[in-house]
Regions:
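Intrinsic disorder/low-complexity segments enriched in polar/small residues
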Residues: 1-2, 74
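N-terminal amphipathic/basic leader segments beginning at the initiator methionine
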Residues: 2-30
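Mg2+-dependent prenyl diphosphate-binding active-site environment of isoprenoid biosynthetic enzymes
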Residues: 30-191
Length: 191
C-alpha cells in the first residue's frame, strides 16, 4: 500500500521529470539567435522554458501512456516522442494565451509564474508578437513530418487544437471573461 505522502512524492517526481523533458524539447526547438528577431525569440523562450509546472503537458503524456495500457499496447520510443511533441505544443499554446492574458488591454498582470510578465519584461508589442509566434510555432511543429510521421494524425491534431483554441474554445472564453469583467450584468444564459 502507498501512503498519501508516497503518492505525492511520486506525482511530484513525475511532474518534475515531465517538465524537464518539455523544457528540453522547447529549448531545442523554439527559435533562438542573435539576428534580426533575437528579441522576439528571447521573449518566446522567456515565457515558455523553465516557466510553470507544465501540468497540461504532464496530463497529455500521462493520458497517452494510460490509453496505451488500456489498449494493451506498449509505448514505443517514437510514440513517446510524439507525446512529448504534442505536450510541448500545448505548453507553447498555453504560454501564448498567458502572454496575451497579462497584457494591459486584458488583465494587466505585472507578474506571471513568479517573474515579470512578458509585456513588463519586454514591451506590449513584443509580448503580442511573442504570443502570436508561439501560436504559429505550435502549428508549424505539429505540421512538421519530422515530429509526427502520420499525415492524417498531424491533420487531426491540428484540427482538434484549432477547435479547442478558437472562437468556441479558449479565445471565446477569454472574450467572455473580458465581457463579464466590463459588463457585470450579464445573464446566466450569456455566461
Amino acid at each position: 500500500k502507498y501512503s498519501m505522502d508516497t503518492l505525492m512524492i511520486d506525482f511530484k517526481g513525475k511532474l518534475e521529470k515531465n517538465s524537464l523533458e518539455i523544457d528540453r524539447f522547447l529549448d531545442h526547438n523554439l527559435p533562438s539567435g542573435n539576428g534580426l528577431n533575437a528579441k522576439l525569440f528571447e521573449a518566446m523562450r522567456y515565457s515558455s522554458i523553465k516557466s510553470g509546472k507544465k501540468i497540461r503537458a504532464f496530463l497529455v503524456v500521462e493520458s497517452g501512456k494510460f490509453l496505451s495500457v488500456i489498449n494493451n499496447k506498449d509505448i514505443t520510443k517514437s510514440k513517446y516522442k510524439e507525446l512529448i511533441t504534442i505536450a510541448s505544443v500545448i505548453e507553447a499554446i498555453h504560454s501564448y494565451s498567458l502572454i496575451h492574458d497579462d497584457l494591459p488591454a486584458m488583465d494587466n498582470s505585472p507578474t506571471r509564474r513568479g517573474k515579470p510578465s512578458n509585456h513588463v519584461k519586454y514591451n506590449d508589442h513584443t509580448a503580442i508578437l511573442a504570443g502570436d509566434a508561439l501560436f504559429s510555432w505550435a502549428f508549424e511543429t505539429i505540421g512538421n513530418g519530422n515530429f509526427i510521421k502520420n499525415p492524417q494524425k498531424r491533420a487531426d491534431i491540428c484540427y482538434i487544437l484549432a477547435k479547442a483554441i478558437g472562437p468556441n474554445g479558449m479565445v471565446g472564453g477569454q472574450q467572455a471573461d473580458m465581457d463579464f469583467n466590463t459588463h457585470n450584468n450579464l445573464s446566466l444564459e450569456e455566461i
